[in-house]
């Protein structure tokens, strides 16, 4: 490494069988490609690994070989030079028919440059075939954890998805913004139906939508986010002008949207506008929404209790609560919600209290309820498993009412939540459960895929909620393949 770059070019050339005359003839070409003109006389030991690789690649490709082996060379160096090397490789393949063997950990690079690929793991061939298909399967497992059994299941599902999947089995419902996605869901689920009531949830917090979901169901009303606290988003405003509801309920737990309330009061057809919430705690807000339904004799004989830490579970339960018009109670983090449950249960002579998720069980089970009231706890340890159990419960409940042929899927990722505020009403209207899939967990993915496969005779289509923040194309293809 004490040699200069100039000397190293001749040494490497000799090791590759190039004569000194050959190197002399192509020296300028090698230096120009490697872009090291200013550093030729610098000791190679002072070069970065990327600069060393530049020289090695330039020397190796100065001729047109029969076989070119590129072993991780493209993993170092800057992006522009990597692109330059890829262009040289493509030229050798397309213009000269050179066989190129690339050893790389870059999934995208293999799919881009190769037509065949071998996935070698721990010295053994795990998969061989079309480069795009191998890269897809490799990428589908990358970054995801789970049991060996789940990994094998998802691996085989990924392999199958490259061979057989019906794209028509999977449809994405999304738009440019979260509010626009919600508007699209409202139009798809209610269509031209005359709407008498409408529930708007101020979207500074998803609590408004979660707690208001049962009220919207009892009113048979669309639920949509406002899209802001200073004014209605254009998409939300357009929905209101299209449907012209007689009454609008604005849910604003924090009392941060007086401007939206004023905007609603000034709508040209002059709907009755009621605002619920004013710098409330979650317990206070839950009680206010409950009282609103109680005063209108909307509630049946069921309650739903969801702990604040079970937010994802609340979205999974939303279609069920909407379908049956069940009031949703959510306490403060520091509060024991048993008192609120007991008070509301007595007010409607509750026969069933549903506890969704794993964190509110103690509060519900310690509530002093009458003997005729049944407690149903639906959930599991771990957010992903808990959401799955709730969604499966909803599927079975809806199936008893008559299968619709639809299931909805979305991502468990927190970034997806703003798009899910309207999902309770949408999924309920089409009688579809909402599965929140954790695309980082092989265990959860395998459970979702197994569920689809077990029920494929009754499922016509998978509806993917959300676009930019939702499940990616690979996940969509994987889900669709489970129905094949």
Per-range role (PLM):
Residues 151-484:
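Extracellular glycan-binding segments that recognize GlcNAc-based cell-wall polysaccharides
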Residues 82-95:
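Helical segment within the ABC ATPase nucleotide-binding domain
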């Amino acid at each position: 490494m004490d040699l200069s770059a100039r000397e190293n070019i001749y040494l490497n050339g000799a090791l590759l069988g190039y004569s000194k005359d050959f190197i002399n003839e192509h020296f300028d070409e090698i230096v120009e490609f490697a872009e090291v003109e200013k550093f030729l006389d610098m000791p190679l030991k002072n070069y970065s690994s990327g600069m060393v690789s530049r020289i090695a690649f330039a020397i190796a490709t100065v001729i047109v070989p029969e076989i070119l082996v590129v072993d991780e060379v493209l993993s170092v160096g800057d992006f522009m030079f990597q692109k330059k090397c890829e262009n040289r490789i493509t030229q050798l393949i397309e213009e000269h028919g050179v066989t190129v063997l690339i050893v790389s950990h870059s999934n995208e690079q293999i799919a881009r440059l190769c037509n065949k690929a071998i996935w070698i793991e721990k010295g053994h061939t795990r998969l061989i075939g079309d480069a795009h298909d191998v890269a897809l399967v490799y990428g589908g497992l990358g970054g995801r954890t789970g049991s060996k059994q789940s990994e094998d299941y998802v691996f085989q599902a990924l392999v199958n998805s490259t061979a057989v999947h019906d794209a028509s089995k999977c449809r994405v419902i999304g738009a440019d913004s979260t509010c626009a996605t919600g508007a699209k869901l409202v139009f798809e689920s209610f269509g031209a139906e005359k709407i008498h009531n409408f529930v708007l949830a101020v979207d500074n917090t998803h609590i408004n939508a979660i707690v208001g979901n049962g009220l919207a169901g009892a009113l048979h009303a669309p639920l949509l986010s406002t899209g802001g606290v200073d004014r209605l988003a254009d998409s939300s405003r357009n929905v209101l002008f299209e449907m012209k509801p007689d009454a609008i309920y604005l849910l604003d737990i924090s009392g941060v949207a007086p401007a939206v309330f004023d905007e609603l009061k000034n709508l040209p057809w002059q709907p009755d506008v009621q605002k619920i919430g004013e710098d409330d705690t979650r317990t206070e807000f839950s009680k206010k929404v409950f009282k609103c339904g109680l005063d209108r004799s909307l509630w049946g004989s069921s309650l739903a209790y969801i702990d604040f830490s079970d937010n994802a579970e609340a979205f999974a339960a939303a279609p069920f609560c909407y379908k049956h018009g069940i009031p949703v109670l959510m306490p403060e983090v520091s509060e024991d919600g048993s008192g609120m449950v007991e008070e509301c249960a007595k007010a409607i002579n509750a026969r069933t209290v549903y506890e969704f998720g794993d964190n509110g069980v103690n509060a519900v089970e310690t509530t002093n309820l009458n003997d005729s009231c049944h407690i149903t706890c639906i959930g599991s340890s771990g957010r992903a498993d808990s959401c799955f159990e709730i969604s499966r419960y909803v599927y079975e409940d809806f199936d008893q009412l008559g299968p619709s042929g639809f299931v909805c899927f979305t991502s468990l990722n927190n970034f997806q939540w703003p798009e899910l505020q309207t999902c309770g009403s949408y999924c309920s209207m089409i009688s579809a459960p909402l599965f929140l899939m954790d695309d980082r967990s092989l265990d959860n993915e395998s459970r979702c895929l197994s569920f689809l496969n077990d029920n494929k005779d009754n499922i016509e289509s998978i509806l993917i909620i959300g676009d930019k923040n939702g499940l990616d194309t690979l996940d969509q293809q994987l889900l669709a393949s489970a129905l094949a």
